[in-house]
């Protein structure tokens, strides 16, 4: 009897098994929402919305209508009457949770979601956070760092409210955070860090001043953060962590589109460092050729042009990508899928750590960047050979400057361009 029953049970196809894997991931992510108590993680609730909804979108799954409506309504209650989004209803508005809330609403898409953002009040909040030295405060009397610059500039760019007043001196502040290693720190004098490096680089691109950074040295620093375990570390001599698949991998993805500026800086540097002009300097710069550019700083744009910078985010992913990946994309996919992935859903820092919403979001974002890193256009389907595992592993493409799914970004860009 048992043998007969077993014989009648159909063997699942490869496609069915792959679909079950995707469904288990999506089910796990939905369960994360269902199991969050009302008072849990109250100061980062917009981040929980972003991490979870962005992960679902990356997996190519639609958002449940009730979940979408509840999320928009909740984020409306987090929106401060004077602009910006707080970590929860009635709390202080904060640039980080503003970024998370706006990215969530963009990912949900649709008029109700996008129109819920009070752009005028939000602009006023950003102006209040802007500092004379070019930096931004995260909140009233809060810290001033590169993360604040990125979250403000990113939100202003995607909402089509970026202007000269918000841009003024931002490039100077970020430039002062580039360290002797090449990466960027959170503030002047601190240690280079993967998260701040992505934030600073992305912000400089969005304000049209990326040529002021020492890009060859920055590239040197980032590519050497990919460790023998195949993942990325956040700082020199630290352990690899799955979340840096996006923070460092995203920085490399941005640099991949800046190859012409990198080539120009290296060519210009070679004119300064010669045997006759600087023999002592040349002796101590044997490590890599990009070290020769450490003293080069292009002036960039002294006065920003609002009509140009408002379209930088859109134009950045409209151009064809000329160079191949600048990191080992297959190796990073191996780390994400084999080391960071939990067998029953969710992703983590590394084996032995617990899965969580944050790492699930940024591991998946990094995986998407890897999969499309060989494509000339950001939404061109990659060849199967550059996608580790079955082709059903392929995620949705993201906009590398904003970390939102590409088609949702385009919808938001069209919506806000008409306002």
UniProtKB/Swiss-Prot annotation:
Key word Metal-binding present in the record?
Answer: yes
Residue sites binding Zn(2+) per the record: 241, 243, 359
Q: Which free-text remark accompanies the cofactor?
A: Binds 1 zinc ion per subunit.
* Catalytic activities: L-cysteinyl-[protein] + (2E,6E)-farnesyl diphosphate = S-(2E,6E)-farnesyl-L-cysteinyl-[protein] + diphosphate
The record's GO CC annotations read:
protein farnesyltransferase complex
Q: Spell out the residue ranges that the record assigns to PFTB repeats.
A: 68-109, 119-160, 167-208, 215-256, 329-371
- Per UniProt, where does (2E,6E)-farnesyl diphosphate bind? 193-196, 235-238, 244-247
Q: Name one Pfam family in it.
A: Prenyltrans
The entry's keywords? Metal-binding, Prenyltransferase, Repeat, Transferase, Zinc
Query: What does the record note on quaternary structure?
Result: Heterodimer of FTA and FTB.
Name of the protein: Protein farnesyltransferase subunit beta
Source organism per entry reads Pisum sativum (Garden pea)
Q: Which gene encodes it?
A: FTB
């Amino acid at each position: 009897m048992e043998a007969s029953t077993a014989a009648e049970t159909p063997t699942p196809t490869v496609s069915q098994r792959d679909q079950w894997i995707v469904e288990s991931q999506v089910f796990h992510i939905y369960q994360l929402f269902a199991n969050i108590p009302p008072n849990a993680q109250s100061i980062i609730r917009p981040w929980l919305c972003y991490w979870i909804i962005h992960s679902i979108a990356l997996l190519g799954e639609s958002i449940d209508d009730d979940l979408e409506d509840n999320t928009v309504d909740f984020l409306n209650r987090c929106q401060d009457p004077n602009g910006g989004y707080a970590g929860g209803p009635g709390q202080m508005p904060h640039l980080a949770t503003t970024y998370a809330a706006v990215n969530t609403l963009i990912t949900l898409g649709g008029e109700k979601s996008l129109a819920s953002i009070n752009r005028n009040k939000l602009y006023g909040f950003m102006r209040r956070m802007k500092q004379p030295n070019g930096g931004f405060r995260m909140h009233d009397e809060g810290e001033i760092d590169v993360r604040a610059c990125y979250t403000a500039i990113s939100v202003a760019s995607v909402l089509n409210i970026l202007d000269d007043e918000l841009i003024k001196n931002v490039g100077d502040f970020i430039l002062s955070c580039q360290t002797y290693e090449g990466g960027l720190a959170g503030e002047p004098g601190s240690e280079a860090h993967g998260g701040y490096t992505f934030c600073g680089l992305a912000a400089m691109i969005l304000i049209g001043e990326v040529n002021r950074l020492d890009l060859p040295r920055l590239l040197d620093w980032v590519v050497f953060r990919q460790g023998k375990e195949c993942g990325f570390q956040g700082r020199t001599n630290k352990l690899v962590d799955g979340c840096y698949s996006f923070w460092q991998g995203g920085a490399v993805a941005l640099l991949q589109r800046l190859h012409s500026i990198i080539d120009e800086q290296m060519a210009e540097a070679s004119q300064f460092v010669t045997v006759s002009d600087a023999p002592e300097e040349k002796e101590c710069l044997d490590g890599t050729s990009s070290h020769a550019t450490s003293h080069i700083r292009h002036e960039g744009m002294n006065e920003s042009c609002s009509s140009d910078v408002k379209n930088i985010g859109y134009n950045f992913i409209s151009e064809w990508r000329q160079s191949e990946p600048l990191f080992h994309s297959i190796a990073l996919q191996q780390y994400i899928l084999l080391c960071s992935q939990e067998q029953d859903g969710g992703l983590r820092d590394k084996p032995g750590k617990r899965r969580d919403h944050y790492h699930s979001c940024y591991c998946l974002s990094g995986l998407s960047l890897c999969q499309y890193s060989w494509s000339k256009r950001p939404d061109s389907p990659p060849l199967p050979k550059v996608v580790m595992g079955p082709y059903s592993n392929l995620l949705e493409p993201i906009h590398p400057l904003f970390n939102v799914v590409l088609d949702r970004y385009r919808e938001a860009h069209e919506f806000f361009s008409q306002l």
